[in-house]
């Protein structure tokens, strides 16, 4: 009966492929264009538009093993991970789906056959629930499948009726449970003991047969569908005779690795489960492009990492450890998900860097928390304490709650939320947002795009829009948007800028400045340059050819750059964003550190070599799964149709792309990197240019080089040598100037000592030194203290920009009476500043030189009271 988790995953897919289902790869953990979801949390998420009827697929049956995350947002299992047998932040959902193909009879039959024949589970161990009004499903289970009627339970809508939202597709569901036997406590679903571990839900079959309207009424769908989900970890536990998901082969391998790297000896410690669970969600999220940050999905990832690190320290980890477990994750899941191996270097680097950052404050934060708990009255940690740990030491509130839970305490969530709200209010800045009419505009039309084949064509004006409202006509000088029946204008997508050009009419010209999409309609923005435009007018659309061609060259360059980066830095490099314009490209990609000069040189060489090879740029239409299996690069977070456009440039680059491109790579002429920088944790940006735009950049650079040659009296051959000589000479002069200033300061100090005053037997120097470098004040004070042996010095100077610099020095024998920090702040206050330092030396600044004389006059009376 025992099967490995990997065998079950593959066997499930094979079973349904043999039943005529299309095997579909897991969708991204980051849902595309679905603001209702923080992370993908069910197998049906990637098919949502198919169920809604807004997306057509080439098949009507599908099967998948979907990676899911439930942490943060509405669906959040984070707090329970490690404390229960079946809660995880990351899990896999096995599923089979029907889009208007088969329905209840086949879905129930497939599930029963898989469980009892393919897996060999005893039939008397399986119980079933049905929606209490779904007599059809009940009849199938009892009369056709042969399940004992006492094992078929009717359950209400709360647990056995599923809906996508308040409106839309919905329907009853049927759940299958496994009975672990009388030795395990718990009762059947629907009873008071249902939360026990005896009866475990393993499969949920949803029958989407209704469409719910806003008024609550429901009507039958013309083509009912099926959505099913079975947790891989749960069915693996049953097949491996385990009562906890954490006892299955996959988790046992991870738990042993956690124990190894942390030095833990008790393999039953709950913290081992926490860390083993968290390496899965963290590894997969980073592979899917999520980076640790302080907001949104990135903050959820950061919370999970920090929770894992804290539990690792509980286990005894003394050094950075979390990234070391990733290797075991690859061992356990790398065959099913090759991306884990491809991005190994990148993921480990991100995990290590994040842990190192948190480790700096973890111990101190725990000390603060322990101190607060020692003085805590009651069982609730105050919200302001929770906020302090978050704001100062980076403790997410749920991490503090986790620690509190271990000690039988809770946190004041309302108080924490209030403190957070007050911080946001303090940090809030006024922002003005323009209205994006393309997002508010609803145009029930599909524009035919002809721009791959031609840059001009005839069309009819179907809609005119001004500031989000439909109009019938635009006159000369009016700005607005034009929607056509067909267009050669490419609409902004995939980072490529929208086309510009003209719409020529019999009685006018509309100048197109940009093109975007609204649904399936292409929206041409611009103004009427001459005459007028009316709905139903015939137009001749002409794209700005030179601009389009330049954009196409830069778009092709992003593909070559992407490939070159992966060849140079590793396969962890993936595109995170891009901007393709007529005169430049901007390419964002995943990488953990700045590129060295050698790496940039290698990338540039590889791209230009591909340009010199003059590869033909070939485009093909392919099935999405076929394209992925051919190793065509798919962009993170991008949603693709079933038929995709694949752009290939020799054997150098193959990507899924709907943009416009050069005909051959040689058309790019020359590739030149302008800059490389970091824009976020783990994300770098390259700005570059090709073609005539690159020629222009080189011309400008040569002009600057010629100008530099003239200034240093050199030429292109010895320019570097001349500049080095100039820099060396400058450093020598700077050193001489510094030495002269030091001598002047020393002399000034000697003169000041001669004029020192005495206050109660103590030598005191108070002076405003004009023209001295503020950096030399400290040296002057040190020299004066050494010469006086016992005394107090207060010096000030005003720079050319009216900035006041202050310093106070107190000899060691006097610091019990006078603290340098208190003294310097006495003077700093009137000049609009403050400072600090050691008891014997402190510095401050200010911005009100007019008050300096009065401020220095405060020193003597103040010292008289203390000496």
From Swiss-Prot:
- GO:BP terms for this protein? alanyl-tRNA aminoacylation; negative regulation of DNA-templated transcription
Q: What HAMAP family does UniProt report for this protein, alphabetically?
A: Ala_tRNA_synth_B
Q: Which reaction does it catalyse?
A: tRNA(Ala) + L-alanine + ATP = L-alanyl-tRNA(Ala) + AMP + diphosphate
Identify the stretch annotated as signal peptide in this record: none
- Pfam families tied to this protein: DHHA1, tRNA-synt_2c, tRNA_SAD
Q: Listed disulfide bonds for this chain?
A: none
Q: Which SMART domains match?
A: tRNA_SAD (SM00863)
CDD domains recorded: AlaRS_core
What does the UniProt cofactor note say? Binds 1 zinc ion per subunit.
Q: Record-annotated residues binding Zn(2+)?
A: 555, 559, 657, 661
Q: Which UniProt keywords apply?
A: Aminoacyl-tRNA synthetase, ATP-binding, Cytoplasm, Ligase, Metal-binding, Nucleotide-binding, Protein biosynthesis, RNA-binding, tRNA-binding, Zinc
Recorded domain comment = Consists of three domains; the N-terminal catalytic domain, the editing domain and the C-terminal C-Ala domain. The editing domain removes incorrectly charged amino acids, while the C-Ala domain, along with tRNA(Ala), serves as a bridge to cooperatively bring together the editing and aminoacylation centers thus stimulating deacylation of misacylated tRNAs.
The name on file for this protein is Alanine--tRNA ligase
Keyword presence, RNA-binding: yes
Q: Which PANTHER family match?
A: ALANINE--TRNA LIGASE, CYTOPLASMIC (PTHR11777:SF9), ALANYL-TRNA SYNTHETASE (PTHR11777)
Q: Does the keyword Lipid biosynthesis apply?
A: no
The cellular component terms of Gene Ontology attached to this UniProt record, alphabetical and capped at eight, are: cytosol
- What is its subcellular localisation? Cytoplasm
């Amino acid at each position: 009966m025992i099967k490995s988790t990997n065998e079950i995953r593959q066997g499930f897919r094979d079973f349904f492929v043999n039943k005529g289902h299309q095997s579909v790869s897991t969708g991204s953990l980051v849902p595309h264009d679905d603001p209702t979801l923080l992370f993908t949390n069910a197998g049906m998420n990637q098919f949502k538009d198919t169920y809604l009827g807004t997306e057509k697929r080439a098949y009507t049956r599908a099967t998948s093993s979907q990676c899911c995350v439930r942490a943060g947002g509405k669906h959040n299992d984070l707090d329970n991970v490690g404390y229960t047998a079946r809660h995880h932040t990351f899990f896999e959902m096995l599923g089979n789906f029907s889009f208007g193909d088969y329905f209840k009879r086949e879905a129930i039959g497939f599930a029963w056959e898989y469980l009892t024949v393919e897996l060999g589970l005893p039939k008397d161990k399986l119980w079933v629930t049905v929606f209490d009004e779904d007599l059809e499903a009940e009849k199938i289970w009892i009369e056709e499948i042969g399940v004992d009627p006492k094992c078929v339970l009717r359950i209400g809508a709360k647990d056995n009726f599923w809906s996508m939202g308040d409106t839309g597709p919905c329907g009853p569901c049927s759940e299958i449970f496994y009975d672990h036997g009388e030795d395990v406590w718990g009762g059947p679903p629907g009873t008071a003991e249902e939360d026990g571990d005896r009866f475990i839900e393993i499969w949920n079959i949803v029958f989407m047969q209704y469409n719910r309207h806003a008024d609550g009424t429901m009507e039958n769908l013309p083509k009912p569908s099926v959505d099913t989900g079975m947790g891989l970890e749960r069915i693996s536990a049953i097949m491996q005779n385990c009562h906890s998901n954490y006892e299955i082969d996959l988790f046992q391998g991870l738990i042993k690795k956690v124990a190894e790297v942390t030095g833990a000896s008790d393999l039953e410690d709950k913290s081992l489960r926490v860390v083993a669970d968290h390496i899965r969600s963290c590894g997969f999220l980073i592979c899917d492009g999520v980076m640790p940050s302080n907001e949104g999905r990135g903050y959820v990832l950061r919370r999970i990492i920090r929770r894992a690190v804290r539990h690792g320290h509980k286990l005894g980890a003394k050094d950075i450890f979390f990234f070391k477990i990733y290797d075991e994750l690859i061992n356990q899941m790398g065959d099913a998900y090759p991306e884990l191996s491809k991005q190994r270097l990148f993921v480990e680097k991100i995990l290590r860097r994040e842990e190192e950052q948190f480790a700096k404050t973890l111990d101190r934060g725990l000390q603060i928390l322990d101190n607060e708990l020692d003085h805590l009255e009651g069982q609730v940690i105050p919200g302001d304490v929770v906020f302090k740990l978050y704001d100062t030491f980076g403790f997410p509130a749920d991490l503090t709650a986790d620690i509190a839970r271990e000690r039988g305490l809770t946190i004041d969530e309302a108080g924490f939320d209030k403190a957070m709200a007050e911080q946001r209010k303090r940090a809030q800045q006024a922002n003005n947002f323009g209205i994006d009419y393309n997002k508010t505009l609803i145009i029930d039309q599909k524009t035919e795009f002809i721009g791959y084949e031609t840059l001009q064509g005839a069309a009819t004006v179907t809609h005119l829009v001004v500031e989000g409202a439909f109009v019938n006509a635009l006159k000369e000088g009016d700005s607005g948007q034009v929607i056509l029946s067909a267009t050669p204008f490419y609409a902004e997508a995939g980072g490529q800028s929208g086309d510009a050009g003209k719409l020529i009419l019999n009685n006018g010209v509309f100048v197109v400045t940009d093109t975007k999409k609204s649904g399936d309609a292409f929206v041409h923005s611009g103004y009427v340059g001459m005459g007028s435009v009316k709905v139903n007018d015939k137009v001749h659309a002409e794209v700005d050819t030179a601009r389009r061609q330049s954009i196409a060259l830069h778009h092709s360059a992003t593909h070559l750059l992407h490939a070159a980066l992966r060849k140079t830095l590793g396969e962890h490099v993936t595109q995170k964003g891009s901007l393709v314009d007529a005169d430049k490209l901007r390419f964002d990609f995943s990488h953990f550190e700045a590129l060295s000069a050698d790496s940039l040189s290698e990338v540039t060489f590889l791209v230009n070599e591909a340009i010199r090879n003059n590869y033909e740029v070939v485009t093909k239409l392919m099935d999405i799964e076929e394209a992925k299996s051919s190793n065509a690069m798919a962009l993170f977070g991008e949603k693709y149709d079933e038929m995709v456009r694949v752009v290939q440039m020799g054997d150098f680059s193959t990507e899924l792309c709907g943009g416009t491109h050069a005909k051959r790579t040689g058309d790019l002429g020359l590739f030149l990197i302008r800059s490389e920088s970091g824009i976020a944790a783990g994300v770098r940006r390259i700005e570059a240019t090709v073609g005539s735009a690159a020629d222009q950049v080189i011309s400008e650079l040569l002009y600057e080089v010629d100008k530099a040659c003239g200034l240093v009296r050199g030429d292109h051959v010895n320019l570097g040598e001349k500049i080095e000589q100039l820099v060396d000479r400058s450093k020598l002069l700077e050193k001489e100037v510094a030495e002269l200033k030091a001598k002047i300061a020393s002399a000034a100090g000697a003169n000041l000592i001669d004029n020192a005053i005495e206050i109660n037997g103590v030598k005191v120097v108070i002076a405003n030194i004009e023209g001295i470098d503020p950096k030399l004040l400290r040296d002057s004070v040190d020299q004066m203290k050494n010469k006086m042996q016992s005394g107090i010095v207060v010096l000030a100077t005003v720079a050319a920009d009216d900035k006041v610099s202050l310093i106070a020095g107190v000899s060691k024998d006097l610091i019990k009476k006078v603290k340098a920090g208190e003294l310097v702040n006495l003077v700093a206050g009137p000049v609009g500043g403050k400072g600090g330092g050691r008891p014997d030396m402190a510095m401050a600044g200010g911005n009100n030189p007019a008050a300096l004389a009065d401020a220095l006059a405060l020193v003597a009376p103040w010292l008289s009271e203390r000496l």
